[in-house]
Amino acid sequence: MNGNEFGRLFRLTTFGESHGDAMGCTVSGVPAGVELSEEAIQEDLDRRKPGQSMITTSRGEPDKVSIKSGLQDGYTTGTPIGMVIQNKDARSGKYEPFITAPRPSHGDYTYSAKFGTRNWGGGGRSSARETVNWVAAGGVAKQVLAQSDYDVQIKAHVCQIGDVVADDVTWEEMLEHSEDNEVRCGDPDAAEEMRDLADEYQKEGDSIGGAIYFECRGVPRGLGAPRFDSIPARLGQAMYSIPAVTDFELGIGRDARTATGTDYTEDWEFGESEATASENASGDEPRARGDPKPVGNDHGGIQGGITTGDPIYGEVTWHAPVSFPKTQETVDWETGERKEITVTGRHDPVLPPRAVPVVEAMLYCTVLDFMLLGGRINPDRLDDRPGEYDTDYHPSSPRNDPEDADTHATTVDED
């Protein structure tokens, strides 16, 4: 099976099935010298894990991450970082009826058709549980960026569930409110309506779709490449890889369909400059000025597939979860019968509340990959000091050799 890797220099490779022993990933391309905190990665995993509220699946997974490689004394060494998350609460019995009677709108039939077999417990590899690996990798990327010379900040919140749409919120409102409610919405009033709506569908044995708004700040200008490695192309791959995503928008997105060229085009002006004109400069000489800057940001921080330095923003849309208790119809290819089925496993009635950290993680992974590709961050070492070996993150020699050591080193008197 291919398609298990994402990224060019910062590369994520994942493994695991929903009801297997464990989930895991290998992250390569992490520069040496990053002080990596397992606890910080865990914080993001806790935001994604199941069982957080009454509108999430009741599956009791602690999602505890364990870093297995790539660290020495708490610092990255430049070698691949391996992480494992054990599955603790898998119950595959309820999925046995669907081995040859595929659930509607799932990957059951298509996986069997492609490979001639599949891991059927909990959906196996096609389950959204696999995104736990992405959040772990995003936690690594987030820490690399936080310790770099760039102040990259990324935040997302649920902007719509069903027909309940949140008001536009500021960056500060997202930071203040989105983690204060079960649906992770930056608009507290809309959050209550969204919560009630999700609860209503859950009680009816049904589900509902929704959307997430995201914003990236501090991304420097000049990242991305024309055509197939453009920022929109790579972000689109990242977002459409998330299970159940049906739409991805940048900037004003679908509203561009009704905008005229004169409305959508943004003029250029000089931004503010930190520099000032010389005290003795004559009035005829040009004064210090800032860099060219677009007037407005309908383009979402990207022009020609390359970043402008303005905030990158957009929306991601999910269809309703297709596992729910209401009766559905399918066919059993082994018996040749039509069957009525009820999917009674533990499932979310709406996906965006738990998908917020997934979106943020994939944004962090994508932005860091472009920063490495663009030379903004040294891919070998974070301190960008090639050839220097006596660093504050290099392991120190022991003061005394262990008594049972087979080898030893003693100081030589140079006199």
Swiss-Prot record:
GO cellular component: cytosol
Recorded superkingdom: Archaea
Annotated metabolic or biological route of this protein: Metabolic intermediate biosynthesis; chorismate biosynthesis; chorismate from D-erythrose 4-phosphate and phosphoenolpyruvate: step 7/7
Keywords associated with the record: Amino-acid biosynthesis, Aromatic amino acid biosynthesis, FAD, Flavoprotein, FMN, Lyase, NADP
Compositionally biased intervals (Gly residues): 298-307
Single Gene Ontology BP annotation: amino acid biosynthetic process
Residue positions binding NADP(+): 48
Catalytic activity: 5-O-(1-carboxyvinyl)-3-phosphoshikimate = chorismate + phosphate
Classification via SUPFAM superfamilies: Chorismate synthase, AroC
Cofactor annotation: FMNH2
Gene Ontology molecular functions: chorismate synthase activity; FMN binding
Enzyme class: lyase
NCBIfam families documented for this protein: aroC (TIGR00033), PRK05382.1 (NF003793)
Protein name listed in UniProt: Chorismate synthase
Organism: Halomicrobium mukohataei (strain ATCC 700874 / DSM 12286 / JCM 9738 / NCIMB 13541) (Haloarcula mukohataei)
